[in-house]
Amino acid sequence: MNGVWIEVRVITSCEAIEPISGIFYGLNSQGVAVEDPNDLLTRDQGPLTWDFADINVLEHKGEFAVVKAYFSGDDDLEKIVSITKEKVKEIQEMGIDIGKGIVECDKIKEEDWANNWKKYYKPSNITDRIVVKPMWEEYSPKNEELVIELDPGMAFGTGTHETTRMCVKALEKYVEHDSTVFDVGCGSGILAIAAAKLGAKLALGVDLDPVAVESAKENVGLNDLDNIEILEGNLLDVIDGKADIVVANIIAEIICILTDDVSKALNKGGLFITSGIIHERVDMVTSKLDECGFEVMEVNKDGEWNCIVAKLK
């Protein structure tokens, strides 16, 4: 590799950060960094302080975000860029605003990568009670804060996206000490980890992607939890028994496909917490939930995204 990395960048909208990050994880990138002007502001409020005043994207607050991925210098740059462009177009066809949708690339020296990408990740309050921190950062919990430790270099981001925040807030509200929680499409495992830290009797994370499963298992290890398990496969194929809560932070189309299986995996009166739903897809999801025997209890909004909490009748 000769100390060289490939950096691929997508200039996009804040709405598309999560799905575009997913593209890069699917391409087995070695790490992903996000420059979001809405997050990377120097701010003094609250116990956590960010100091990103040197980042030029601050001049464009709210206009666009930049998602960067890093690959080995030995990887096929032309192929990576071609697939990225194709996948970005697919995201746009799903109705997600991709903003400029510009794909760029560069080759950078290894020392630049090593020194640059970690500076974007600092401890962050995703709710009033829960803090997510990268594994290399020190953080002392305040009062009754719960700290989730992640390795964001492995896959699936830092857990600060709006959809993740809303799911965690819902888990805070509904998880009880005798709860069994299934996290479907678990990615980094952050939602299963949050459920376990909130006191669930058992949290199970499930994902079809072996990279996600490896990432989630590593993150579970970082948090030293014994009331959580990560499994590879489809929900009903790999999980025995039923849950009190199923949480899925995916996209609306996949949620609709999953809903019937989720109804079979829940105890009567159990809750389905789901996010990754843009405004234009809310009616589609609520209609499918009704069709599968759910009563919609909450539709929460954060930015361009929605989180639905539904109860199995």
Swiss-Prot record:
It catalyses: L-lysyl-[protein] + 3 S-adenosyl-L-methionine = N(6),N(6),N(6)-trimethyl-L-lysyl-[protein] + 3 S-adenosyl-L-homocysteine + 3 H(+). S-adenosyl-L-methionine binds at T164, G185, D207, N249. Keywords: Cytoplasm, Methyltransferase, S-adenosyl-L-methionine, Transferase. The keyword Protein biosynthesis does not apply. SUPFAM superfamilies: S-adenosyl-L-methionine-dependent methyltransferases (SSF53335). It is an enzyme of class 2 (transferase). GO terms for biological process: methylation. Its EC number is 2.1.1.-. One of its GO terms (cellular component) is cytoplasm. GO terms for molecular function: protein-lysine N-methyltransferase activity. InterPro entries: Ribosomal_L11_MeTrfase_PrmA, Ribosomal_PrmA_MeTrfase, SAM-dependent_MTases_sf. It comes from the Bacteria. It is found in: Cytoplasm. Belongs to the methyltransferase superfamily. PrmA family. Methylates ribosomal protein L11. This is Ribosomal protein L11 methyltransferase. It comes from Clostridium botulinum (strain Eklund 17B / Type B).
